[in-house]
Amino acid sequence: MKLTFCCKLVTVYLLSALSIPALRAQLQPIGIFDHHQDVGDPALKGSAIYDAKEQTYTVTGAGVNMWTNIDQFHFLWKKIKGDFIIRATIRFIGKGAAEHRKIGVIARDKLTTDSRYADACVHGDILSSLQYRSTDGAQTEQVELSSYHPTDIEFQRSGNTFIFSAATFGETYKSVKKELPLNDEVYAGLFICSHLADVKETAVFSNVRIVIPADSNFRPYRDYIGSHIEVMDVQSGHRKILHSAPNSLQAPNWTPDGKYLIYNSEGLLYNYELATGKISTLNTGNANQNNNDHVLSFDGKQIGISHHVGQRRISTIFTLPVSGSDQPKQITMQDTLHSYLHSWSPDGKKLIFTGQRNGQYDIWSIDIATKKETALTQMATLDDGPEYTPDGKYI
């Protein structure tokens, strides 16, 4: 380091030290984001509202454009290091004043108006593109993705590769990508730009998720990166996170009365009460090494579980009342090797499961009363995941 720069560097560090507490004091956390603000000093001030019940972000902003070497927009950001995936369902409010109003997801080195960046940009007309500025102050460029209005977007960083994927609800994603060496830590999040200095536009972002991908040495079923329990409206696709945990939460069963979700975690089963969010342990007695193959009976009165028995940890099927039991009833024998439950018959008399028998995994049925097993498939390849139809005629 040259001595001639010493004073300037000291000044910068002092200013940074003084400004960091002030900046932290001014941060306005909103939902999963650290802050929201205008970038590029638009003539009209933007805003953002988080609806905690619906888990949606309503974002309003102005700005002449996000193009050439100057950007003006409203920005909800979070500082993220390394790889990430940001997903959102997007919707403009109203017809709009300019065809080139813009919404999307962006990653920037800085909060300056001419910062290097890459984004997933959806315009008010039929254009969607991955826009980028390769160096500070350079002209914006783009890689066009589509000529339709997507409802769902995903913006991914993998090293120096940025990938923009988009689709209309229910359709297949299309993708484009661009290599761009942004900083390892960037400001990433949601944006809106009206394309007009004297007009504000509004958009709603729902199903917003920030995902940090697993490490390259990730070992499935041995390493875990956390879990959300979500519910989804199957007509609209709108999702809500009910519960999050740093460990693995698996396979929620929705009770027929609509009151509970029953899920497994680290060998035990839990009740999640939908009305209150209260979580309680479901008593399964000594069956405390359960995997994620647990199933409610059609009437909702019984639950079947798959518990790993003994030192060999053989997955074995038990049944018990949905209210819990100290002594679940054993249905399959561990000396027949693994049995993974998948469905009750509608009359509650039989179970079907994936069974390890005769050196392969096939679909089996078992009579609960007699314990008699019947092979339904006999194939060398893995057969898995059988379910009864509600009328019990088909599997």
Regions found by a protein language model. Name each.
Residues 8-9, 18-21, 136, 167, ...:
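Serine/proline-rich low-complexity intrinsically disordered segments, especially terminal tails, linkers
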